[in-house]
Amino acid sequence: MADDNRNFTLKIITPDRVFYEDEVSMVEFNTVEGEVGIYKDHIPMTMIVAPGILTITRGEEVKEAALHAGFTEVLPDKVTILAEIIEWPSEIDVSRAEDAKLRAEERLKEHDPGTDMNRAELALKRAVARIETVRQ
């Protein structure tokens, strides 16, 4: 790996396990304010994670996972993501994700006053993140 001194520690923790912990050169993911890419020596900050694809770059190696919700703490030499749910492509059931996508789309189309539209939109985003992660 070229220029190891440009790496930082990425740690991703879920309620069930340490999902990932290693030195990386960049991590990209969605926040409620848009997509971000983090390199070493980034200014310290905290962010709320939004559903989408998390991309981990380690030298020439790139890994992706479906990240659904959580919080991120960014320090100059370490990024910690506290994730409610995150899945590698091999852990995703595509047919289940496609079914969830269809259900969420139907709920959004119906405009039923009893439907929590924010919840339906989040369900749709999570399903799309799962599907796109597997198909990348």
Predicted regions and their residues:
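Short, charged, intrinsically disordered terminal tails
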Residues: M1-N7
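Compact, glycine-rich, soluble single-domain proteins
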Residues: K11-R103
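Acidic/glycine-rich phosphate/pyrophosphate-binding loops and surrounding catalytic core
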Residues: I86-Q136
